[in-house]
Amino acid sequence: MKNAFRIGNVLCILLVLGVFVGCGDDDPVAVNPPTVDVNEAGSIGIYSDTDGRYSRLTDTGGSVTFHIVHKVTDGATASAFRIEEPAGWVRISATSEFAVSIGNLDDGISIGYGECRSGSIHVMSLTYRSPGNTVPGSTFKVLPHNEWPENVQVVNCGDQ
């Protein structure tokens, strides 16, 4: 992606998620995401809601839907990334909110937003079968696309 703004640190888009079973406790535990240094490119994370407000994800031992949300103030027209899930989680489906997407979540997917968008951009919905016994502290990760391994790619609205 020529002229793409890059999110400089994988940690700025990694959200620690509460994906675990509490030992005999049915009350899921929330884990707050780390402080994020949001730059012009914004941040991309995995949330339990389409607005990117709730990062609590729980292992219920069944089908669970999560959402990839790109939070950006100055606007973006596209992004490229890949997803790494904890051991035992099986992806059932991945649906982009936009018509143009190339690639896959394992090696890397590039998604065009169709126009300049800002705020909380709901990029994708992911449905997984959770194992019911995820190790505490396990995380889902948003990582760089394999074609551009140095950073997650974001096309700023000014780069159209």
Language model features: what each stretch is:
Residues 1-11:
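Bacterial N-terminal signal peptides that target proteins for export
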Residues 19-22:
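C-terminal motif of bacterial Sec signal peptides marking the signal peptidase cleavage site
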Residues 25-160:
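Acidic, low-complexity intrinsically disordered segments
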